[in-house]
């Protein structure tokens, strides 16, 4: 699925996608392996730290980690009534607090590198001004233009986004809560500027491939695709 996808060319370019996706795979694998095993949280936290060092969006992995800790503590049930007791539980377990803080630590290494190379530790944010005006317009206009000019290359962006959302809804039904949380936040990020990189964010988050694999693997006629 990864190498046959339309955006697999990112994996062959001089980008960090390949390393980033590998770290995400490691993160979620150990996050779900032997649920509640605190040693696996260490591996996931280390993978998240390296991911945040590789790409800034890796910082978001801290949220799936916290959510999975919550789910493991309360046997997969999400209730706001347990939120207070969960916070108390976290403060009583400094090891878990350390694991949570370890996740975004890589961004500081990234910022130090940027400061050394460019003299601007916030270069990853400030450089976005170069891509703000991508001409794609708001998502509503893009969807409208897509149906009026289906052959325009940029108008496939909303279609890819809609298909990704469908996959995420399916994953929610299958109780992939941590994965979907990461995917949704990653999906929101491009809206802070232009949406030119929307497809790259969707493919690079790796989560959509987990959902597609789960779906195809459950279908006898399509099992070979999974």
Regions found by a protein language model. Name each.
Residues 1-31, 41, 50-61, 199-206:
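Multi-pass, polyprenyl lipid-linked donor-dependent membrane glycosyltransferases
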Residues 5-6, 44-47, 162-167, 183-190, ...:
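Hydrophobic, membrane-inserted alpha-helices
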Residues 7-12, 110-114, 182-197, 211:
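Transmembrane-helix signature of polytopic, lipid-linked glycan biosynthesis machinery
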Residues 26-33, 64-72, 167, 206-223:
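Transmembrane alpha-helices and membrane-interface helical segments
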Residues 34-43, 151-155, 174-180, 219-224:
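Membrane-helix interface segments
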Residues 50-51, 58-182:
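Membrane-lumen/periplasm interface segments of specific transmembrane helices
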Residues 100-104, 218-226:
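Signature aromatic-anchored transmembrane alpha helix within multi-pass, membrane-resident enzymes
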Residues 170-192, 201, 205, 225:
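Transmembrane alpha-helix segments characteristic
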């Amino acid at each position: 699925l990864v190498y046959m996808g339309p955006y697999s060319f990112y994996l062959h370019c001089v980008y960090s996608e390949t390393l980033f996706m590998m770290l995400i795979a490691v993160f979620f694998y150990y996050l779900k392996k032997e649920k509640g095993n605190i040693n696996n949280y260490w591996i996931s936290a280390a993978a998240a730290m390296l991911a945040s060092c590789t790409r800034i969006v890796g910082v978001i992995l801290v949220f799936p980690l916290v959510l999975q800790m919550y789910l493991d503590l309360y046997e997969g049930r999400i209730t706001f009534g347990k939120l207070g007791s969960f916070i108390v539980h976290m403060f009583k377990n400094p090891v878990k607090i350390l694991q949570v803080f370890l996740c975004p630590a890589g961004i500081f290494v990234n910022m130090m590198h940027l400061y050394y190379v460019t003299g601007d530790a916030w270069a990853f944010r400030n450089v976005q001004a170069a891509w703000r005006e991508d001409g794609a317009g708001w998502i509503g206009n893009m969807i409208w233009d897509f149906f009026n000019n289906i052959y325009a290359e940029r108008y496939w962006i909303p279609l890819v986004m809609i298909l990704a959302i469908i996959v995420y809804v399916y994953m929610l039904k299958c109780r992939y809560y941590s994965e979907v949380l990461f995917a949704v936040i990653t999906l929101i990020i491009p809206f802070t500027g232009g949406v030119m990189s929307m497809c790259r964010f969707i493919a690079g988050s790796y989560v959509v491939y987990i959902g597609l694999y789960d779906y195809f693997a459950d279908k006898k006629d399509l099992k070979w695709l999974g």
